[in-house]
Amino acid sequence: MIDEKMRSKSIGPFVRQVKPLSPHMVLFVLLYVLSISVFFLTVSEAVCNLQDRDSLLWFSGNVSSPVSPLHWNSSIDCCSWEGISCDKSPENRVTSIILSSRGLSGNLPSSVLDLQRLSRLDLSHNRLSGPLPPGFLSALDQLLVLDLSYNSFKGELPLQQSFGNGSNGIFPIQTVDLSSNLLEGEILSSSVFLQGAFNLTSFNVSNNSFTGSIPSFMCTASPQLTKLDFSYNDFSGDLSQELSRCSRLSVLRAGFNNLSGEIPKEIYNLPELEQLFLPVNRLSGKIDNGITRLTKLTLLELYSNHIEGEIPKDIGKLSKLSSLQLHVNNLMGSIPVSLANCTKLVKLNLRVNQLGGTLSAIDFSRFQSLSILDLGNNSFTGEFPSTVYSCKMMTAMRFAGNKLTGQISPQVLELESLSFFTFSDNKMTNLTGALSILQGCKKLSTLIMAKNFYDETVPSNKDFLRSDGFPSLQIFGIGACRLTGEIPAWLIKLQRVEVMDLSMNRFVGTIPGWLGTLPDLFYLDLSDNFLTGELPKELFQLRALMSQKAYDATERNYLELPVFVNPNNVTTNQQYNQLSSLPPTIYIKRNNLTGTIPVEVGQLKVLHILELLGNNFSGSIPDELSNLTNLERLDLSNNNLSGRIPWSLTGLHFLSYFNVANNTLSGPIPTGTQFDTFPKANFEGNPLLCGGVLLTSCDPTQHSTTKMGKGKVNRTLVLGLVLGLFFGVSLILVLLALLVLSKRRVNPGDSENAELEINSNGSYSEVPPGSDKDISLVLLFGNSRYEVKDLTIFELLKATDNFSQANIIGCGGFGLVYKATLDNGTKLAVKKLTGDYGMMEKEFKAEVEVLSRAKHENLVALQGYCVHDSARILIYSFMENGSLDYWLHENPEGPAQLDWPKRLNIMRGASSGLAYMHQICEPHIVHRDIKSSNILLDGNFKAYVADFGLSRLILPYRTHVTTELVGTLGYIPPEYGQAWVATLRGDVYSFGVVMLELLTGKRPMEVFRPKMSRELVAWVHTMKRDGKPEEVFDTLLRESGNEEAMLRVLDIACMCVNQNPMKRPNIQQVVDWLKNIEAEKNQNNREEPEEEEET
């Protein structure tokens, strides 16, 4: 052992002074440093718990992100990985995973169950899917915060005891957020996890598909709860009084469900409650005065229920209220005077009730924070309340549909933020004064004053409007006021106006051409006036209707509040409509206009609706109308138009309504595309029209351009007709003889040598041998289930009776479909393609070969094809029961034959066929034109998707939509109007519309009013929002005992038609959901909702 003294002495010189190190000493120091580094490196590698690391690697292997992939590497300490945190214990266990908004897709693997110390898991706002692992919630028994919101997790919650790690039955979980997923099933009181979540403070499962009753037992198991959100699900039954046991509850949200019964009075004993959100249910009863005990309440929203009675008189005790929305109920009485004590109100909506009395008793001046005030569609009387002019923060106010009197006061100018103001359908007077004052509202963008100021004269002087008047006005409506005078010249100064409604007045004079100079005007209604003269050509220079780019550039920054701007349709009930949904439109119907329809109308290529009915227009229908490729409605009825209906109008693929009744038109009605679907009544009143839906033959002599004298016969003409008839018959006989001979010369094994030319009109004639023509043999694929080995064009023509009109069984975007009956009795469906498709013709053979390989039990099989000169023919399986459209809309007895099990099976079959196209078939196929007429039914009503793949076949998300292939009106996804790209999610939207057709029995365009577009979808959303989902169902399906299943399907359909394509499910999800819905009768008879009338 070395003596301490000697040791001190030996190292003393080294400490006291620096001497050059010997080589041996340098080597020693380097080795020492290296060993220390290796030691710390080994320690570093050992920081991450190996079991946790493996679990995380397994997790990363199950997820992916094209946007922001995880860069987790086993060579790096997992505690340093992005989104991962570890504790400070010797084991260095993972305690936190935070990977929100990373674009992750894939499943959540069961490996996360091995993270035994995990206290926080946040995977929100990703694209994760699939079920949650069994035992997931109870296995993670250290979890404090769980956030899986905004994903696509499906299935039931794994709420039972884990089969993995044990638990003492107590879970420290504090926050659970599973909102905005696809979860379903009931939340039962037998849940081990929820029964043991004593410290739970926040539980959010909104925007899923949970069923059963609200799990009120949670208030007993988790007395610390402060937030419960069950909104946007399918919960049913009553609200339980057990919810009152959540004594600390500050937020209770259960809106947009199927809850019924009364609001339990016990809920009004929750002293901390700040938000009570229960709209769009079927709640009934009265609002008990005990609600005034909720003195901390800031939000009370009970709209779209069946609540009746009066608003509690002491409502003013809720002095902290910022949002009070009780609209669309059956409330009666007057607005309590005490409401003025709710001085913090920002939103007050009492629209569509049965409230009455005068408004002057309410001191609105105390609402200094009020921004939105909606008292429309009640029965308020008396003077217009002047105290509203003191609400300095007001941006929108509606008093429409009441019985208010008086005049607009100059005090309205004190509302400097006012943007939306409508008081239509009241008894206001002094239009000139109102316009003089309101033009000073600098931010006013929407002004609707319809059905007021009766029989007054509109100020017409151009100088009436100041140079700075109405600087922001975009929506202007003074319809149905019976105003007199001419169209006021000062309107030319409204340079930002987009929507103008002057209908149902008594305006005289001519339509001023300067209307066509308003740069943003896309919606003009001059209907039901006494206007005379001709249509000015300048009117058809509206920039917003000439260019899609100009139309898209309109600002549309007005407030999105529902309005009624259609007073001229007195035969229908008033309906609320979003201003942004108004289609590009010109209504000039029922006036006294004369002259011709200017050819300049063809410049308005953005126009969706053109209605000129009920005038005295003469001349012909301009062929230039065919340039309006977005046109949906064209009504020229009740005029003096003559000549023929332009055949070019058949190219308007969006056209869903066409009416030329009661004119003097002549000649054949165009056939093909939508013209085969327009009703006969839309062509009546034109004695010289023939063909088409009139089913009358067109006699060439009947429409001769040479006018015959009375009782006289032109002998030259008769001689010419006789000679022509003689030579025509002779030529036909010769051709028939040649065809018979050619048929006899063709042996069955040499049928490919038969050469026949198919003309555009469907007739055929022999072609000289040796001519360079394409094959005339019909090529049948190996998947053909028919015993037909050889089939020639001649036999196909014979089977269709030369494509006779009597054999037409369908009409698609590419041409007509004929029934072909072969000699052996076999029936086929023959689609004869029409038009010039350019690139598609060059690739026709290759594309149909690809289509023939698409084999699925729910796809109409392509049996064969033929290419011959300009003719393109496809051979399909014949479906005995025709199309779904026929059974739903055309056959009067059809809907009754489609009971609920049949309709559900049709949805299941069609969705399966579409899923095959989207996910299995190679290349994937975007259908582009899913509609009820493209879903065919066999003899057992099994569904088959038809017309698939006739558009260009390329990979998903890269399919450009052309005017020929964009789809059918009513089924077209909204995003197709912004980016002309067909997508898989676009198909899902269209299929959602088909589902709504099956549920409602209505056409996609059947319920819309002249100023609304694609309204089956909007109508269904409105009915759901107003708490009346059962009322959308086909009356033939109601009270069938299947209401629960139908409501589930309705929810699925509504997800499919979501305006945001990214929020739509994929078609496989739809298939899975539909498979889980049973059609048997529901034993729980649902209470029928009361009729609600929205005036």
UniProtKB/Swiss-Prot annotation:
The keyword Nucleotide-binding applies. Tyrosine-sulfated glycopeptide receptor with a serine/threonine-protein kinase activity. Regulates, in response to tyrosine-sulfated glycopeptide binding, a signaling cascade involved in cellular proliferation and plant growth. Not involved in PSK perception. Involved in plant immunity, with antagonistic effects on bacterial and fungal resistances. Mediates activation of the plasma membrane H(+)-ATPase by PSY1. Its EC number is 2.7.11.1. GO terms for biological process: pH reduction; regulation of defense response; unidimensional cell growth. It catalyses: L-seryl-[protein] + ATP = O-phospho-L-seryl-[protein] + ADP + H(+); L-threonyl-[protein] + ATP = O-phospho-L-threonyl-[protein] + ADP + H(+). Keywords: ATP-binding, Cell membrane, Glycoprotein, Kinase, Leucine-rich repeat, Membrane, Nucleotide-binding, Phosphoprotein, Receptor, Repeat, Serine/threonine-protein kinase, Transferase, Transmembrane, Transmembrane helix. It is an enzyme of class 2 (transferase). The lineage of its organism: Eukaryota, Viridiplantae, Streptophyta, Embryophyta, Tracheophyta. InterPro entries: Kinase-like_dom_sf, Leu-rich_rpt, Leu-rich_rpt_typical-subtyp, LRR_dom_sf, LRR_N_plant-typ, Plant_LRR-RLKs, Prot_kinase_dom, Protein_kinase_ATP_BS. One of its GO terms (molecular function) is protein serine/threonine kinase activity. LRR repeats lie at residues 91-115, 116-139, 141-165, 170-195, 197-221, 223-246, 247-270, 271-294, 295-318, 320-342, 344-366, 367-391, 393-415, 416-439, 441-466, 470-494, 495-517, 518-542, 566-589, 604-628, 629-652, 654-677. The modification Phosphotyrosine is found at Y876, Y916, Y971. Residues 803-1074 form the Protein kinase domain. SUPFAM superfamilies: L domain-like, Protein kinase-like (PK-like), RNI-like. PANTHER family: LRR RECEPTOR-LIKE SERINE/THREONINE-PROTEIN KINASE-RELATED, NON-SPECIFIC SERINE_THREONINE PROTEIN KINASE. This is Tyrosine-sulfated glycopeptide receptor 1. The keyword Nucleotide-binding applies. PSYR1 and PSKR1 mediate a signaling pathway by two distinct ligands, which redundantly contribute to cellular proliferation and plant growth.
